Each structure stands twice: as C-alpha cells, then as structure tokens.
Amino acid sequence: MSLPDHPSTKPEVSKDGSVHRTKVLLLGTRRSGKTSIQQVLFNDLPPKQTFYLEPTMRVTQHLYDAKGNSTIIPLELWDCPGNITVDTLGAPLSDFSTVVFVVDIRDNYQQPISKLVEFVAGAYDVNPGINFEVFIHKAEKLQEDDKIENFRQIQERVTERLADESPEYEQVALNFHLTSVYDHSLQEAFSRVLHKLIDSLEFIEGLLNVFCSNTSSPKAFLFDTTSKLYVATDSSPVDQATHTLCCDYLRMLSSFAPLYKSNAASEPRVHALSPTPTPPPTATSSSPASTSSARALLSQSPSDEPSSGVAKKSLFYPSAAASLSPSHPGTTLTYHLVTPHLALLALLPTTVYEMRKGLVEWNVVWLREGIREIWEVEKTRSTTTHFT
Ligand SMILES: Nc1nc2c(ncn2[C@@H]2O[C@H](COP(=O)(O)OP(=O)(O)OP(=O)(O)O)[C@@H](O)[C@H]2O)c(=O)[nH]1
C-alpha cells in the first residue's frame, strides 16, 4: 500500500483516481474492545455478538467509503493488536489524522496509560496536529457514580503522566469520551470524532440552525443513514436521550428501506416539482398528521439535474413522522431523507408539524439545496466525495 508523505485530514484523489482515505488508528490494550467498536459501528454487528470476536493478531485496515460501507468521509480504520508499538505499526504516525485509543474502564490503568503516552510522544514530533480521542470503554458496566469517578481519574492520570514526560505534550489535543457498544454513546462519540474531519461542518451547522429557528425545532441532526453517525447538528446542546431517540427511529426506518427502494425504482410514479420551490411562508394545513405515519415525498430538486442537461432519474426522498406523546407531549419526531445517504431528524412542536406542514417541507427543500451546494463545492475543491 502506498502511503502519502504528508499528514492530511482530507482525503485526496491519487493520480489513478482512487480516493485516499482519512486514516484513523484504533489502539488500546488487549481485549479493550477495539474490534467490537469497529464492527458495531460499521458492520452492524449486534453488540452481544462481539463476545465471539477473535483476538486481532496483526494490523488490519478496514476501508469505508460513500459507495459500499457508507460513511460521510472515506475512512481507513486501522485495527491494531494490543501489543502494537510505534515501531511495529508499519506506518509513520504522520499518516494518521486521528488516533482512537480505547481503555477498558475497569482495567488497571497503568498499562493503557503508558501505551497512550508512548503514542502521544511518538506523534508529537511528526504530527502535532493529530487528534487523540480516548474512548473510556465498556462504561455501561459501572454504576453512574463509579463511571464518572473512573472517567475523571483516567483523565487526571493521563494528564499527569504527559506533564511528567514533557510539558510540551500538554499541547497535544486529547479528548475523552465515555463509550459502550450497548448504547448509543459509541455512535455519539465517533460522530464527534468525525466532526473534526469535516471542513464544511460550520456551514452545515449554520443550515441546521436556520432550519431550527424557521420551524421552532428544539433539535435537529443530520445523520449518515448507513453508519447512523450524525454528521452535524444545530448549536443547541446534544442530550443523550434525544440522540438515542433519533438513532432508534433511524434504525427502525432503515429496516423498512427496502420497501422504499422498490418504490423508487418505479419511475413513472415520480413527479417533478417546479424547479424553484416557492416558499409558502404562512402555509397552514388543517389535515392532522397521523402518529407514527410514514409518508412518501417524491421530489426532484434543481440540483438533481446533472449539469449536462441530460435528465437524470428522479430521486426518491421518503419522509416520516412520529408523535412523541406521552413521553414528550406536544413534540413530533420527523425524518426527511435529504440526499441518498443523509437524513434530517428533527424534533418539532406538533402544532408546527400539523398546522404549518408546508413551511416545514419548504425548509427541508431549502436545507437539501444548501447541503447539495456544499457538497458540490467540496467536490470541486478536493475532487473527492465527502457526502453522497
Ligand atoms: N461490557 C462490554 N463489553 C464489551 C464492550 N465492547 C467490547 N466488549 C467485550 O470485550 C471483549 C473484547 O472485545 P474485542 O473487540 O475483541 O477487543 P479487542 O481490543 O479488539 O481485543 P484484541 O484484538 O485481543 O486486542 C469482548 O468479549 C467484547 O464482547 C462494551 O462496550 N461493553
């Protein structure tokens, strides 16, 4: 495998047209849960099945891109055995954008911390900009108080050890996350890891902020539908319960995806909307939304047309909504696919969803346009695909 000479947080296209993926190193001591993390996140392995995973004996590269194993950034995830060292890794640390270091929350921390410090020291000279993400893993094993206490202790010890080694290492960016394959904390943590690799993140966040303020939405996420990682969210804080709710809803809808696909394949049913969507700013709809209803929206935006002018097959964008009563009275969870691989999940006041449906849909079309424009700019700039 040919490796680039310089660190890069962006995938580039090599001369032969193949995409250089963003490299992420998955490190940690034996049995800390590295392979489980990779398998649960990207191969949909049920968490309980991780029990049967074989130990990793040599460095294994897993490729994820927009076509097959979809993720928003073409990734190359290096799953390493527990005994790997900087010298035996087989690639310079300058090749990696991010190191995800996994620590079993119930472990004796001495050994994992020494290994982490070894890699921080190894990376410092060659790639000081590398992101170190420490996953304090298997968190669900402990009670809430113990979990927080262990999390704090690990952070403290790592910081102390780094300061003992050299004051310079304090400059290395280290981020700590509590994770478990048994809940959505892993997806949330890995989403945050990816956010640092998305150049256009602030523009996407800006679009989501506008969507939220126009529709009175308290929270909106843009999810990658395959990996179930969120690409961006609006600027209000993420609370775990809302994130979990959105992940579960997305997972449930994805299980119905084959039904939508077969519809999408039947072209004559697709109606093109007018090329410029007309905003219905005061649109009110008296038709109440049925709870837990899934409704197909067939739309074709101007950017669906290739620039050559040749009519491309219209895309199918399903949408769905579910009332969150009684747990969240007066709130509706909505889902809108905005590109073939990205979906908007938003909480909306039920009154807005039911009474101002036109306004909501216009804002979805507007968001879709914005995301496609960003995608086009990204594509032109780096001639590579971050979003599909
Ligand atoms: N309770 C709990 N167990 C987990 C979690 N993640 C992984 N495990 C378990 O941890 C054990 C080791 O998982 P692996 O993914 O094989 O760990 P690894 O770090 O890849 O191991 P090596 O390849 O030997 O270095 C398995 O029995 C998993 O089921 C978690 O979040 N919670």
Report residues per predicted region:
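Conserved nucleotide-sensing/catalytic segment adjacent to the nucleotide-binding pocket
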Residues: 63-97
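Short hydrophobic/glycine-rich mini-motifs in sensory/regulatory modules
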Residues: 337-345
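Inter-motif core of Ras-like GTPase G domains
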Residues: 85-112, 116-127
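Switch I (effector-binding) loop of TRAFAC-class P-loop GTPase G-domains
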Residues: 42-72, 84
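A charged amphipathic helix-loop-strand protein-protein interaction module that recurs
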Residues: 204, 237-333
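Canonical P-loop GTPase G-domain recognition
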Residues: 130-132, 140-219, 238-242, 248, ...
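Glycine-rich phosphate-binding P-loop
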Residues: 22-45
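Short, flexible boundary segments at extreme N-termini or domain junctions of P-loop NTPases and their
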Residues: 1-29, 62-66, 163-166, 179, ...
